[in-house]
């Protein structure tokens, strides 16, 4: 089965959707990879906008299908970004989210895992039934931290909740977004405040990130060589290490090997 990676933050504007989208695209850049994104911010999710997609259907339509949903029928509700990446979008209107339960989300994730090597999930900012269901099904939880005091206060609460839910350090990964942004605390100050070491840090780079959002082109594609894109590729590698195959032996090496 595929690996489920959820991105969470209990503070709006932390860059959750930006990181979720670019992480998914980075994973999809791997040879032969197949990646699904689930927008589980059911009321106000905008993953589709970040990818410049107009969804033909959403998770609400998939849930309305009922118990007969399987990985083949789920395909009809996905919106294709490219041949390696597809999105199951949030409902078009907030009220449509009311019919979707945590059980529905778990069932859908179960089917997505059968079809995709990686399933990246963007979430709402509150620990509601939907978010908790996503976390239960996740193999890795990326918690986004910021370097301002209100975000740090919320971050401490978020980590306490995750601890109380018995999610281990092997599953929860704290990532500092917009590291060393102007006016923010340094990486070292934030680590000291939270009493932890970050799994990864992503630099602040509004000149790359904002145009990418406004044009609906993920920066890992539009600005592949930028520092912010490279750190997302590194994050993808840390979350799901890619095995580097040994280069094929030359004919001379093979011949010499016979006599060794």
What is each of the regions a protein language model found here?
Residues 1-36:
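Walker A (P-loop) phosphate-binding motif
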Residues 1-4, 164, 171-172, 176, ...:
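Acidic-aromatic/histidine active-site loop/patch
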Residues 30-87:
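Phosphate-binding loop that captures ATP/GTP phosphates
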Residues 38, 227, 237-244:
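C-terminal-of-GTPase-core extension/linker across diverse P-loop GTPases
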Residues 59, 215-231:
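C-terminal boundary of histidine-terminating zinc-finger modules
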Residues 60-67, 93-99, 149-150:
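Flexible beta-alpha connector loops of hexameric P-loop NTPases
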Residues 99, 103-206, 210-211:
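Conserved catalytic-core segment of NTP-binding enzymes
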Residues 234:
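Glycine-rich phosphate-binding loops of nucleotide-dependent enzymes
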